[in-house]
Structure formats: C-alpha cells, structure tokens
Amino acid sequence: MPSQSVKECQRCNALTKSGQRCKNRTCKSGKCWVHLKRDTGLRVKPSQVSGGGMGLWTTKRIKPNQLIGKYTGERMTKAQVNQRYVTRKPQYVLCSGNRCVDARKTNSSAVRFANDARGTRFKNNARLKGLSLKSASKGIPAYREIFTGYGSAFWVNR
C-alpha cells in the first residue's frame, strides 16, 4: 500500500497570500504552525498531560460531530505492524479492522498528536471513527487541547 509523506521534516506545503509556496520547514504536520492554524484551526504544542509529549490544540471552536482530520501515515496490515514492532510498542499506530496506519515517521497530519485523557484529570472531547478524528457531541471550545480515547487494545501491557 502507498505511504503518505514519510519524511521527518519538510518544507511547508501551504501557499502564502501571494500564491507562493511557504518557505518554512515543518516536522509535525504537512504545514508549518502558521498555516496549520490558518487552514485548520489546529496547533501542535506541548500537552497538558504529564509525560504526554506534544498535544493537538484548537485555536477556534469546533462544532459538535465535526471532522477534525484524518489519521494518515504509512498504510499497513496488522501482520505488518506486528512484524515491525516485535521489540517495542507501536506508539503512533491506529488500526480499523485489519487496516492500520503508522504515523510514527509521517508529518502529513497533526491528528497523530491527539492524546488520550485516560488516567488524567482531563476528559476526552473527540472520538476516533475509523481513521478519522471527530469532535464529540458537545463540540470543543477554542484554545483547548483535543483528547481522544485510544481504545483498550492500545492500553494492553502498558
């Protein structure tokens, strides 16, 4: 299966107001933080979760049940995931049935930075549906971190 943007860092893929390609470099999504915020209303910055690394934040209100983004990366089967991660746990792998996406080395989507609020004082305010992230039925206020449940399979042996 084809992969999507499997590079550690790249030039921003957004266009400036003058129609030129942005010259900023990005390592977290396909767009630099300026264009990610402008085009999607999202930011990647440190999480409020202790040990959570980076988190996905909104800069504008997200309506109830609104698509936040798609989980993208290297497309794999569960068997391929098991072969790759024999000695370590997959941190950025999301599976829906036998279809899996490994976003460990991709920067095509900021959705991979949504953390799970399990075991914290925060509550999940978004949900994964297949390989897409949607806001919960109440929506998400502006300037909040986006949390989603990873599912019980993720938490086995952690």
PLM region descriptions:
Residues 19, 64-65, 77-78, 142, ...:
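Eukaryotic short linear interaction motifs
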Residues 39-121:
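Catalytic cores of histone-lysine modification enzymes
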Residues 1-9:
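Intrinsically disordered, compositionally biased terminal peptides
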Residues 21-24, 34, 70, 80-81, ...:
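Intrinsically disordered, low-complexity regions enriched in proline, serine, glycine
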Residues 10-38:
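Cys/His-rich Zn2+-coordinating "finger/knuckle" modules used by eukaryotic regulatory proteins
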Residues 5-6, 118-158:
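C-terminal SET catalytic tail plus cysteine-rich post-SET Zn-binding segment of SAM-dependent SET-domain
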Residues 18-19, 52-58, 132-136:
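Eukaryotic intrinsically disordered and solvent-exposed regulatory patches
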